[in-house]
């Protein structure tokens, strides 16, 4: 049975050109809609510079290129050359700077000033031109973890084109508290018109991108501790092009009894997650969630014809769902884990099926990190690697079958394992290596380094368990982290030296900072343009701009853009959710890999012709 085709966004070739010491590095997309035999001719200044079509990669080093050169690429199918792509001018360095309209700070009701810094971002094509726009969250300097009292500044959401053109700003208002657990924003084409929408939790006083107020503009539900434990809660879908509110419904589930969520002061009640999933296998649905320490509720919606229609509700308080309480993480993942072509929600140590029924619960409980992908390519299907917080549970680290919940192996820790990573970092071992560490980053001696089969290959694991990134030209994944001095983080990309058991820094740009304190997150990591390698975005020290860094390493490996992989693309959508986690692919990408399967997709909207 052929899988259903999934709705996907229209993308151009994403051609980029970067000046290097050896010449001009040129890179472009191989699309999920391309035939596997598609090859490419490259043009410089209107003249073809390739004698034969390039068939084995989608990058090229033009040793005769200059800083003033202009490039185009054309696909070649069955000997016939297609239209030329959009023109690409040469970057002088491997970075694109996106200027920002930094907002002014303010003063809280108790007289304390605050400023803003650029925080999490997502991307989507909000105008249908095949190029990504940036949706950015501004974080006030007084943003709070839920465990802490205090007023916060207002959360702002901006939209920019990648040339820095400011498009609109949404102000979530005084009745949305600032912090990693409060605002999770989904950027995705939810209705299939070829243009992405933005969906997130709102409240009385939220101002949309057109200046319209949602609810009661004068309402102020903050208590003396700066918390918001009463008043209406909403879910709003905004038009991507303008930031205009398209529809607003009551946020489900409502607060109910504070104690149901795990405490009596509003900490665990206000733990929100969000994701996008193809619950019918063809079109995306919005999934909004509340709670994971005890009560856990997920609600799925379809956005069609300008309205939100509820698809299902999963509530751990429902009879028969008791085993699903207290299993969620500070993040989630989305993938078809049971092979039926429809997505499931992997919610920490549990999973919810595409139809809103419980798929399984391992009972191992809450954790701070989780990775879902083809971690063990010798097995059929996907796996989940997770670290766990409850010292009384049998495992502090576990690897399970993503579809059944079967624990394949685990490691007893007897303590809260704070961070964990799964990535193919050593070509000597097929599949991912996995490890857990305790922040702020010890050497992993307490848990060790394991293969996906559970073989302990070293007492010493990498000290980094933050993000993994495909950066250089081989199939081994690098690690993305930062140097933390107690107040700020200096981002870096490192490569694992298995022979010497250490990390070696291969890229560390100046003038940029990491996000989210000790977590060291980028603004966003995603395959934004060029070939299949990933870009990474960090903020400048003063948050006056974002800097998008791309690799200039040549590679002979050729895959379709990761943004056309179903698991990876949805990973970009949920990356901003709470404790940011890196995206993974639906297939094993690493040493000894098989050729990735061609994704089953169709292009949404009016741009269904072959992209340029």
UniProtKB/Swiss-Prot annotation:
Record note on pH: Optimum pH is 8.5.
Positions bound to Ca(2+) 1: 120, 576, 578, 580
Binding annotation for Ca(2+) 9: 529, 531, 533, 535
Residues that, per the record, bind Ca(2+) 10: 527, 529, 531, 533, 535
Binding residue positions for Ca(2+) 4: 330, 366, 368, 389
Compartments where found: Secreted
Required cofactor names: Mn(2+); Zn(2+); Co(2+); Ca(2+)
Catalytic activity: Exotype eliminative cleavage of alpha-L-rhamnopyranosyl-(1->4)-alpha-D-galactopyranosyluronic acid bonds of rhamnogalacturonan I oligosaccharides containing alpha-L-rhamnopyranose at the reducing end and 4-deoxy-4,5-unsaturated D-galactopyranosyluronic acid at the non-reducing end. The products are the disaccharide 2-O-(4-deoxy-beta-L-threo-hex-4-enopyranuronosyl)-alpha-L-rhamnopyranose and the shortened rhamnogalacturonan oligosaccharide containing one 4-deoxy-4,5-unsaturated D-galactopyranosyluronic acid at the non-reducing end
Positions annotated to bind Ca(2+) 8: 472, 474, 476, 478
GO CC annotations on file: extracellular region
Residues binding Ca(2+) 7: 374, 376, 379, 381, 383
Keyword terms: Calcium, Cell wall biogenesis/degradation, Lyase, Metal-binding, Repeat, Secreted
A single MF term (Gene Ontology): metal ion binding
UniProt-listed GO biological process terms: cell wall organization
Protein residues bound to Ca(2+) 3: 189, 191, 193, 195, 197
Temperature dependence: Optimum temperature is 60 degrees Celsius.
Positions of Ca(2+) 2 binding: 125, 127, 129, 131, 133
Family: Belongs to the polysaccharide lyase 11 family.
Role this protein plays: Pectinolytic enzyme that degrades type I rhamnogalacturonan from plant cell walls and releases disaccharide products. Degrades rhamnogalacturonan, polygalacturonic acid and pectic acid. Has very low activity on pectin.
PANTHER family: RHAMNOGALACTURONAN LYASE (EUROFUNG)
Known partners and oligomeric status: Monomer.
Protein name per UniProt: Rhamnogalacturonan exolyase YesX
Annotated source species: Bacillus subtilis (strain 168)
Name of the coding gene: yesX
